[in-house]
Amino acid sequence: METLNGPAGGGAPDTKPQPAGQHHRHHHLHPLAERRRLHRAPSPARPFLKDLHTRPATATPSAGRAPTPAAPRSPSLAGKAPPSPGPPAAPGRLSRRSGVVPGAKDKPPPGAGARSAGGAKAVPGTRRAARAGPAEPLSRVGRPTGAEPPPAVAKGRKTKRGPGTPPARAVVPPARASRVPAVTLSVTSVAGCRINHTDSSSDLSDCASEPLSDEQRLLPAASSDAESGTGSSDREPIRGAPTPSSGSRGPPPGSPEPPILLAAPPVASACLGGRSSPGGASTGSPGPGSQEDVGGRAPPERTILGTSKEPSLGEQPRLLVVAEEEELLREMEELRSENDYLKDELDELRAEMEEMRDSYLEEDGYQLQELRRELDRANKNCRILQYRLRKAEQKSLKVAETGQVDGELIRSLEQDLKVAKDVSVRLHHELETVEEKRAKAEDDNETLRQQMIEVEVSRQALQNEVERLRESSLKRRGSREMYKEKKLVNQDDSADLKCQLQFVKEEASLMRKKMAKLGREKDELEQELQKYKSLYGDVDSPLPTGEAGGPPSTREAELKLRLKLVEEEASILGRKIVELEVENRGLKAEMEDIRVQHEREGTGRDHVPSTPTSPFGDSMESSTELRRHLQFVEEEAELLRRSISEIEDHNRQLTHELSKFKFEPHQESGWLGDGVSKGPAASVPLQEELKSARLQIDELSGKVLKLQCENRLLLSNAQRGDLAAHLGLRAPSPRDSDAESDAGKKESDGEEGRLPQPKREGPVGGESDSEDMFEKTSGFGSGKPSEASEPCPAELLRVREDTECLVTIKLEAQRLERTVERLISDTDGFIHDSGLRGNGLASPGVQGGGGEGNSPSEPHLLETINVRMKAFRKELQAFLEQMSRIVDGLSPLSHLTESSSFLSTVTSVSRDSPIGTLGKELGPDLQSKLREQLEWQLNQDRGDEREGLRLRATRELHRRADGDSGSHHGLGGQSCFNLEMEEDHLYALRWKELEMHSLALQNTLHKRTWSDEKNLLQQELRSLKQNIFLFYVKLRWLLKHWRQGKQMEEGGEDLEESEHPENVPGLAELGVQGVHQTDGIDQEDADQGCSLPMGEHAPHSLVQISEHGSRLQSSDGGPLNKQVVENQQLFRALKALLEDFRSELREDEHARLRLQQQYASDKAAWDVEWAVLKCRLEQLEEKTEKSLGELDSSAEGKGALKKEREVHQKLLADSHSLVMDLRWQIHHREKNWNREKVELLERLDSERQEWGRQKEELLWRVEQLQKEKSPRRSGSFLCSRREDDTRPYPHQGSLHSSRPVSMWPCEDADSIPFEDRPLSKLKESDRCSASENLYLDALSLDDDPGDPPPLRNCLAEEEESRKGNLQRAVSVSCMSEFQRLMDVSPFLPEKGLPSAGSKEDVTPPLSPDDLKYIEEFHSNDWDYASPRAEADRPPDPWADRTEMGRVGHEATTEPCPDPSWYLTTSVTMTTDTMTSPEHCQKQPLRTHVLTEQSGVHVLHSPPAIRRVDSIASGGEGRSRADPEGPFPMSRARGNLADAKGGHPEPVLNRWPCTPPRHPRDCVEGSLRPLDRPICPSLGFASPLNSLDMSKNMSDDMKEVAFSVRNAICAGPAEPHVRDMACQTNGSRTAGTQTIQTISVGLQTEALRASGVTSSPHKCLTPKAGGGTTPVSSPSRSLRSRQVAPAIEKVQAKFERTCCSPKYGSPKLQRKPLSKADQPNSRTSPGIPQKGFSESAWARSTTTRESPVHTTINDGLSSLFNIIDHSPIGVRAGSRSRSAEPRQELGPGQETGTSSRGRSPSPLGVGSETFREEGGESTPVRQDLSAPPGYTLTENVARILNKKLLEHALKEERKQASHGSSGLTSDSHTGEPVPAEPGSMEELPCSALAPSLEPCFSRPERPANRRLPSRWAPPSPTASQSQSPGHPMSMEEHGEEDPPEEKPHL
């Protein structure tokens, strides 16, 4: 080994120098190439090299293979470490370099080692050098075997070896040293030079690729070849002998080789070692191989010599003769040189490839850089835009806060817009240019493609030319040689030939060059094309990405090429088809001949007589008949197949549709169509329907499969028949046919039908019948030779088999028909169901309108499927009829074949019979006719499936009859059917068909007309129901107004009872009125309220119960029952209403009669009195005349007396008329009151009993509903029920009697899930009947849902006061609805109301805004309105402030809110502004501090405390102020009115015995005290109190409600208990008639419409003159202001903070009014400021421009209008209250109020910074923490506001305390503003009012904000009261202040 090492070492040095160049050369190539290759080792390239090396090595390995195992590990390891047994270091490198070499190394035995080294070297070289200059390594590797490589390889190896050699030597173990050293040397040198690079890379890359090398090693032969180089394999074969020996010697050769290496010059040995292992050494014996390798490695010559010598010394002497050796060596050298050349070429190619790749990579890199730059630019732009966006957001926030529009911002935005436009234009242009470039590039690409194609063509042409030239030259050469031999003399010719040859050679070289060039160009173009593909997508891709598909021209060209190909293919196929057809014809002819033969034989025999009717007499005819029949059968089968495929397609479609429906159940729910049934219960039937549909579809698919199976069976049977016909003698034996039919049956019956599919798959006459055919043929050939030979039996057999075949076909067709029938029936049923569902045809109770949207699509699909199925069925039937005709017509045979064979015989006969042809001819006609008829019929009515079934049955009967008749004819002995007979038969058939069709059509038409009529009937019924409902509503409205008129006269408030159409049980029951049920609470409240007064209360609960029940039923499929129930309820309600009308008319008549009598008696009395007086006068005159005598003075005295008398007479007449009037009124009222009282009491009793029963029933139903429906709905129903039950009780008692808190549904509102609350009501599907809801809502506006209608009836006064008030808000979703509402609205200006003071109460017609407010409040109030069992409820509900429940609790504490307080919150309405505990807490803090200051003790207590307080106060208020206070129904209104009324008692007195001067005031002022007023200070149970303000009301609403409540309660100034939930300022003005106005900042627009001030803006605008202008209308507000400055103050106060814009709506944060603005507003305090009641907040929320905007929410709920119909006094009071309470309070108090203002709510605490100083104080944004109802934006706004508020609050408080106090005191210094006599007469204007305004300083919308001054001259008080904070001032400045109140968000 040492020697080896030494020599190797020596060799290495020698070699090194030489290889160095090579090595370097390779190396240069190598670093990139090899590294890439190494990394790409796994790629084929490297394996290829390895394989080259490996092959030689492998070949070598005979010797080297033993080592190979070790080598393998070295490959991977060696690559990295010298693990290879060989030289540790070298092996590592070697193995690394040559993934395969390691094997060689390990293999190295003698030659293997060398070769392996060479291979290794070569491999590494190849990888490195070969990668770079693969040729060299390869040549080396290859040369190892050949001596050639030595020069190059030797150099390379030496070079490699040089560096690596020493380590190799040192490391290599002695045994392997020879090989390994060589390897090591070569490898090492390689490693040293190149491998170092490759090693590092190859270490990594090889690791991955080494497996390959290992694999190669594992394949030593291959690997040795590869290692030795490509040449090695060649060489190895040469050295085959040596190799084996070396192989055997392999391991030993290690020693031999070392000697060889030693003997050889060091170079040789080195070369040998290095070379031999890679090259021949390993391949061959160590000697030759090694020598060769060494030679290869060593300088070629030296290596060769040395090697040859050495090998001869070492091994050759033994193996080969020296000459042979030399020859071998020469060959090896040649091979090596060739390998080197090839390697060089490969290197060049590789280099070119690398260059190209590099160029592409560079281009990609440039593109990537460009893209990165673009990305950076885009990022930069994004950053800039983000920055701008942030800036803009900040600015917008700023604008929202300040309310000032940033002109600069607008300008900058405009500039940005211009820039953006420019940029977009520029980008557009750039895009166009880029597009142009792209198009150009595509064109270029196209041209290049064309060029490529041309080049390819030319290249092909050149190749062909070259080939031709080559061939010609060869020929010439041959001929020339012959010529020379023959004619040597002809030198000229030879010279010519030489010249030609030369030319040809030159041409060939030129062509080669051109070819090479073309090849390069082609490669370049291909690469470019690849690049384009990567960029633009594949040209072939069906959908080019972008324009990636390449230019259209290119695609055209490609498509043309493809088209050509396809056309060629088509032509080929066409030719094949033609050939096949020809062949087929030939076969048919042959078969025909055979059949004719058989038939002749058959006719020859006498079996024919046995079948007298058989047309076999003419065998040709019969065969043609059969053939025709078979053809017909095949056509039928084809039709069947097509139909089935269509059915399958449709089935798939249907499945798809169903799956769609499956995932869109809501659409399917449309099928039910009934909005009411749209709940969970409704979805249940839908789901069931879906399930059944899915099942049906599954069945359909199964049946389709069966159909397919049967169809295939039919086809196979037809084939069999065909075969039978063709083969003649043996049709499928009965056994076969039976088996098949059995199989078919099995398939069709069981769904294992798929098993026979293989048979079924074939087309008619396809291979599927091969088995049958085989059976038949085999049976025919072998089974029945005797029959074949015996003509008679054969003929009979044939006939029988034919008939059997026909019978089986018929059976299959019948089975198929049955399946189709089943399918059709199923589909029909499905269509019918879905149609019923979708079109409402089947479910009378269901309205189909909703469902039609979805159902049509699916039923339509099903119908199309059905139509096609029926058409298919028709075809089948026609086919079956033909079969039957054939079979029956041939039935004469039936007696011969009693069994199925009879039919088959008949069939076979029929085939031959003329009938067959006739049938065939007529069949299609019949078929088409039938099909048309069927389709027509189907089109007529797709749903008449049952009728179709009947038809089918009849048809079957007819067919049977026909068959019978046919068989009879046959039996008649007719040997053949006469054409006449057949025609008669067909005629009869057709006649029957026509009859059936006419029947079917009649049926269909009948069904159709019936369904149409039914639909029409249903529609008419619906319209009738709707009309009845409208009639009912209008009647109710009329009745209400009638009663209102009476009440106005009597001062009663009964009218309201009838004002809630909802209360009418019928309404809820009406299908129309589904909505309210969801709103169970509202509806129930309203319904009960109404129904009680009308005696319909019980019906209402019934209605709801029945409604629920009906819902259950409907879900259970009892729509009819539901409709019946609804209709019954409606008629019941109508009946009750008519009864009421009758009673009213009767009373009217009685009153009229009484009046007549009274008039007559009075007139008589007057006449008598007049006569008496006249007498006295005359007497007096006489006396005076006598006394005065002739005095002239007597004349004067007479004149004076006359005048005096006239005056007296006038006075007397006036007094008399007044007395009469009053007496009449008193009479009327007393009568009404007594009657109503009795009626109400009776009704209450009866209804209570009814309720007891209904309650049980309802509970049970609710339980059912809960089970079936969502808990939410059931919960609401339960609550409603509960409430319904309780509600009546309170009313039942005296007015004063407090009703159970839980009495009102609202009371339970808390218990009701939040969702079930009014919001849920609005949300519920019931909402669907919006129009009806509107009616109901509108009707209910005046009715207090909470108020028991009976009470209302009783309280005429209250009702009177209420008349004016729109108590309930209707959710108006659109103007049309609103208009409709207004038309029907009982709340429209009460034209019928007396113009008495009560008229003032009349609310002007509601504006949409008013409606909205009403709606908002209504929702809230409705829930809250009912005196919820809050008092009863534990305070815990308060824990849920966020929950409506909280509100509900508050509400419950209060008796039912007055209708005026129906704050309906639209769904959007914020639920609880105060609900969030934070608000409550915050408020309490502020309020507590300031409460005392305000002078109003505002206790911010937790809802529980509040509840208690309210209860207590309610109790006090009731007892104190309103004996009737207990009646919550009008409480809200009444209380407000009373409060405003100026009489604390009237205020509290809901039913003041004496109508308050302002009935409105009475109504509003007499807020019935809460059963237990929450706030004692509120001594009345203001509806607000009763309202669970926290419930659905937004904070603003709560505030408004609270303020209203306070105002209503405004008793002596009692500390207001501020309802935290309300977040209202509880400041109450304690004027003589001070209304406690609690400024309620409307957090949500909902409060806007609060009854009193509830509509913060216009809605609350008092009807100052009792005018009919909508409350919200500015005029009205101004008027009201004029009427009662005090009220204005109150309103202002109310508006003041309550409406703090902040809370009112985040948007509303008002900006401090400019001082100028504030003073203005202050100046016109006398004019009720819309703002007051509206609350600046609401105004701010409302559209600034709309006059009614106040009512319009900023977007929270455009529908949310609270219409305050409460008397203007009340409204004004509430409004002014918002302003006034502050007035009252004075600066300190005001501060208190403001502080009290719900901190979160707009109380104006901070937000309302009392801007009495002229609004200097910045509005304090109150806490924005929004109640749960708040929208996100509101929350954000609230948060922002909170912070701002807190900050502003501090300042505002300071200001409020200082400036605010001053301002307030100035403006409202408590100067009582004279109010209308009935209104609070002089509410001291407290500073509070001003501060209030600032809170809402956000300017009102200009329309709303008409300056009060505009409307009324501001009174000094008013101006005072109107502090900048006053809503009114705000209103005045609304235009001016907008900035202040701009929405924060």
UniProtKB/Swiss-Prot annotation:
InterPro entries: MTCL1-3 (IPR049885), SOGA1/2-like_CC (IPR027882), SOGA_CC (IPR027881). Keywords: Cell cycle, Cell division, Cell membrane, Coiled coil, Cytoplasm, Cytoskeleton, Membrane, Mitosis, Phosphoprotein. Residues 320-396, 424-712, 1120-1196, 1229-1270 form a coiled coil. Residues 1-316, 536-555, 599-622, 728-792, 829-857, 1272-1302, 1653-1683, 1701-1752, 1771-1829, 1850-1945 are annotated as: Disordered. The modification Phosphotyrosine is found at Y1413. One of its GO terms (biological process) is microtubule bundle formation. Residues 22-40 have a biased composition (Basic residues). The keyword Cell division applies. Residues 1-500 are annotated as: Necessary for self-assembly, microtubule bundling activity and apicobasal microtubule organization. GO terms for molecular function: microtubule binding; protein homodimerization activity. Residues 1257-1368 are annotated as: Necessary for interaction with MARK2 and apicobasal microtubule bundle formation in polarized epithelial cells. Signal peptide: none annotated. Residues 599-608, 733-762 have a biased composition (Basic and acidic residues). Disulfide bonds: none annotated. Residues 610-622, 1717-1726, 1738-1752, 1857-1867 have a biased composition (Polar residues). Residues 1-241, 1672-1767 are annotated as: Necessary for colocalization and binding with microtubules. Residues 250-259 have a biased composition (Pro residues). The modification Phosphoserine is found at residues 74, 84, 209, 213, 255, 290, 541, 610, 677, 768, 891, 913, 1270, 1371, 1385, 1407, 1501, 1510, 1577, 1586, 1655, 1673, 1677, 1778, 1795, 1799, 1801. Pfam families: SOGA, SOGA1-2-like_CC. Residues 55-81, 91-103, 167-183, 240-249, 273-290, 1672-1681 have a biased composition (Low complexity). The modification Phosphothreonine is found at T613, T1403, T1661, T1669. PANTHER family: GIRDIN, MICROTUBULE CROSS-LINKING FACTOR 1. Belongs to the SOGA family. Microtubule-associated factor involved in the late phase of epithelial polarization and microtubule dynamics regulation. Plays a role in the development and maintenance of non-centrosomal microtubule bundles at the lateral membrane in polarized epithelial cells. Required for faithful chromosome segregation during mitosis. This is Microtubule cross-linking factor 1. It comes from Mus musculus. The gene is Mtcl1.
